Amino acid sequence: MGVDNLQLEPSVTPWSVDGSIDYDKLIKKFGTHKITDALLKKLKSIIGEIHPLLQVDFFFSHRDFDWILDRYIQGEKFYLYTGRGPSGMSHLGHLMPWLFTKHLQDKFDAPLLFQMTDDEKFLYGQDNSMEKIAKYTQENILDVIAIGFRPDRTKIIIDTKHIRYLYSMAIEIAKRITFSTAKAVFGFKNSTNIGMIGFPAIQAVPCFLPSLIEKKPTPVLIPAAIDQDPYWRITRDIAEKMGYYKPAQIHSKFLPSLESSGKMSSSKPESALLTTDSSEVIENKISLAFTGGQPTVSLQRKLGGNPDACPVFSYLRYLFDSPRNSTERAINCRSGNLLCGECKHDLSSNSVIFISEFQKQREKAKDKVSEFIYEGYSTETIG
């Protein structure tokens, strides 16, 4: 994913994330709300626990998550909606919002619509053929199923396959969003193809499909990385005019690149741990990973490291360490009592185990694909 449309420092768009991200500044820029202790307390009072990804602040921002909880308390169910742009093989950064989405599905018994935006990836990538995107779509679907979503509560929408279920709603949405608005939000230029200009209306459709399925306005919660927020911003602007609730969101941070700044990217395999990587490849990538440590052992012992700038620390914190262990690891890093090689060893061993187990579930998913594919709201209800 990469585009030169929005010139942010650093750059954060639905197609590109470059540089080191200041998430507090991003909250202000996008106009979202920080997840507070009070909101977490409210969530815990409903489901009895706080997911580790909330405890370590990986999910950090929201729009109307408090409203979703209020509606749920009042007895109104909500749908989940998230997705994937199939431009390559999936990596651990993709899995993290999906793992959290599964947690929400389990705790709230919420139906999930999962959108595969194969059309977007074809339109955006100059070198992407439909054949290549179709291959990645099928591969990515296996990753989604391997997460463990319930087939009776989960339906996967493939835009090009299911456009007949999306188009009527898409043009209703498109009619209400001006080019001026889309240009301001996404930074479209004269060189932008007209397919990309119209695509945001397609991505907005699953925000409102649950209302068609349920035959009444139905709340929707979108767990996704913060770079996708511009889509929901324009969708929220028109939702009530169309007779629907504004979609709520809960935003995650990015799993950083193994190479240093920016996010993990499947278009740069050396920067990411892919779900299809062998144990040897995983170990090699981690051994070469950038760290926040000093150039020599003696300097590390003397000066300590910087876990805040270390992708190895981030992976351990968000994926494998408990919040308490992560805090202890950071203290030991800064004091010089912990060396980068020790953290790399911990990450390597944990990643090999996690990905090898995930690959077993991925293999089993090949026999389950048909159970998850969407068949249209007119013939099937998943709520």
Predicted segments — roles?
Residues 124, 130-248:
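Divalent-metal (Mg2+/Mn2+/Ca2+)-assisted nucleotide/phosphate chemistry catalytic cores
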Residues 91, 144, 227, 261, ...:
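Divalent metal-coordination and catalytic microenvironments
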Residues 85-94:
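Short, glycine-rich nucleotide/cofactor-binding loops
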